[in-house]
Structures are given as structure tokens and as C-alpha cells.
Regions:
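Carbohydrate-active catalytic/glycan-binding domains of CAZyme proteins
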Residues: 1-321
Length: 321
């Protein structure tokens, strides 16, 4: 069974960044929870991005409970851009915003998050997509794009302005992945269980990681990680069998096992010349509590591979600061 010698880092929807010699993990939680580490194994709680909540959160989602969802963080020209979402669970009453800082280190005199507000909003009975799970990628031409979405009629890609805090004009949108089972009712997500896009550039390809099936159901969770690839950031993304992700394709990267009932909502990085897959996994021995996993990622004939055994050996320990 999985190692339980120390309290592990409990996160949902983790993303990472590195500033200097310090790694940071940001996750879904009150105000966006984040942690720091020198070695990617031993972590301490840093704090939260928002001490309260974005000023617009209650207006977008009247039932907002303080939890900001599924962040992504990137660095450009010495500034850090953190994207996040506000949503009502199971509804597309959602919006994504961005907040900017000159550093991730709260001990720095330059540390101050400046929120730029809503970038994209979805409204029930108007939009057949969901404005959650933002993730940013820069294409080979230097243009930045945001992938996002869940359920409904699939995952989207939209071009960003050079300032990274608004959409480019004229707007350019693409559907990059979808699954059968989306409802015709704009307020109903249907059974097309797909979410959490993340695009990772490697060896001339854009790799689109997605999560299939159900998260957040405890021991009933069925989450798993899939992938497709494209030579063009806008797609089409095809799996290893040549099936388009827009048509429900997706090559399995990793799924649950006896020790970990389910796992998903990944990001991917290259640190110090090595590739990593970062995600949360629900531990069977701990009542399906979600734990941070950072697994080495290798490549087989141009496709990402992680070792299932690393789920048990690559633990992440929470330390007292």
C-alpha cells in the first residue's frame, strides 16, 4: 500500500512554477492555496493568493464559497500571471480571471497580487461551454493561448492579447477536445465527462492532456489522464490511434489502481532538463483524500509515459515551516 509515514500534501488541480531555487505549487482552495519546496518532495504551506476573494466572485456565482478553482501560473518578462476560475459546481455559472505579481515569494518587498478581473465568463442558457480550468501555452510564434473548459460541448482554446490579461481582438476560438454525451440543454453538463486541458510543448508537438470521467466523488471517483498531440497549437489533436480528441479520442496516460482509486487534472513541466507530470490522486488507504503527485515523465515513440509504481514511491511530504 501507499506510504503513510508523514502527512502528505493534499491538493486538488495542482500547477507548478519555479522562482530562483524555490518550487511553488498552487491549487484549488480558499483564495488559491500554495506551497513551496526546495526539492519537490518536502513542502511547506506558503499561504493563499487572495486573502479574501475576488471582488467579482459573488456577482458571477452567488453561491460562491470562497474556493477558487484550478489555477495556472506562468512567468513572462519578470512577472507572474496566475489564472483561476470561479464556478458553481456542476453548472456553467463560471468565470476565469487573472492576477499578477512581480514575485511568488511573500517575503519579498515586491510581493503584491494585482487582480485584473474577469477574462472569460460562461452563462447558463447562453453558452454551451464552461469557463473553468484555464491553462496557458505559448506557441512557436510567441503567441499565448488559453485552453479551458469541461463537459458540455468540450474544451476550448482562445487567443490572448500580448498583455496576457485579456483576450486578443478580433477574438479567435477553437474547440480542441470533446466527448459524446454532452446535453443539448445549455444549463446541463450531460455525461460528456472531460475537463482540465493542459498543453505541453515537446519535440515539435503540442501535447494536449485532458482528464476523463468523474473527479471529486471520493471512492466513487473514476478520473484518469489522457493525451493527444498536434503539430499546430489549434489542433487537430489526435491520439496514438489517430482518433481526434474532438471525437472522444485520447490515449490513456495513467489511471487509478488498488492504492489510488482515481487521479487526474494534471499539468506538465520541464525542470532542470527533466520532464514531470503533476496531478492529484485519490488515496484508497486514506478514504480517497486527494494527494499531490509529481512523477518523472519519459517518452516512448513520441508519447508521454509515467511509471505507475511511482504513485507509491514519489510521495510529497508536508512540513512545518
Amino acid at each position: 500500500m501507499a506510504c503513510a509515514n508523514a502527512k502528505q500534501v493534499e491538493v486538488h488541480d495542482p500547477v507548478m512554477a519555479k522562482e530562483g531555487d524555490t518550487y511553488y505549487v498552487f491549487s484549488t482552495g480558499p483564495g488559491i492555496t500554495y506551497y513551496e519546496s526546495k526539492d519537490m518532495e518536502n513542502w511547506s504551506l506558503t499561504g493563499r493568493v487572495f486573502p479574501d476573494e475576488p471582488s467579482w466572485a459573488q456577482r458571477v456565482a452567488p453561491g460562491f464559497n470562497g474556493h477558487l478553482w484550478a489555477p495556472d501560473v506562468i512567468e513572462k518578462d519578470g512577472k507572474y500571471y496566475l489564472y483561476y476560475s470561479v464556478s458553481a459546481f456542476g453548472k456553467n455559472t463560471s468565470a476565469m480571471g487573472v492576477t499578477v505579481n512581480e514575485t511568488l515569494d511573500p517575503e519579498s518587498e515586491d510581493y503584491q497580487w494585482v487582480d485584473y478581473g474577469i477574462m472569460v465568463q460562461s452563462v447558463p442558457h447562453r453558452d454551451h461551454w464552461n469557463a473553468i480550468d484555464p491553462a496557458i501555452v505559448q506557441d512557436d510564434d510567441g503567441t499565448y493561448w488559453m485552453s479551458f473548459g469541461s463537459f458540455w460541448d468540450g474544451l476550448k482554446l482562445v487567443k490572448l492579447d500580448d498583455d496576457l490579461v485579456r483576450l486578443a481582438e478580433p477574438q479567435e476560438w477553437h474547440t480542441i477536445a470533446a466527448r459524446p454525451g454532452a446535453s443539448d440543454n445549455t444549463s446541463d453538463p450531460g455525461e460528456g465527462a472531460i475537463e482540465a486541458p493542459y498543453i505541453f510543448k515537446k519535440n515539435g508537438y503540442y501535447y494536449l492532456f485532458v482528464s476523463f470521467d468523474k473527479c471529486c466523488r471520493g471512492m466513487d471517483s473514476t478520473y484518469n489522464i489522457r493525451v493527444g498531440r498536434s503539430k499546430d497549437v489549434t489542433g487537430p489533436y489526435l491520439d496514438r490511434d489517430g482518433k481526434s480528441l474532438v471525437e472522444g479520442g485520447g490515449t490513456l496516460v495513467l489511471e487509478g489502481n488498488d492504492d489510488w482509486v482515481a487521479l487526474g487534472h494534471n499539468s506538465a513541466y520541464t525542470f532542470e532538463g527533466k520532464d514531470y507530470l503533476v496531478f492529484h490522486a485519490y488515496e484508497t488507504a486514506d478514504n480517497a483524500i486527494q494527494k499531490l503527485r509529481i512523477l518523472p515523465m519519459s517518452w516512448d515513440d513520441g508519447w508521454p509515459v509515467v511509471d505507475e509504481a511511482d504513485l507509491n514511491t514519489r510521495t510529497t511530504n508536508l512540513l512545518e515551516k
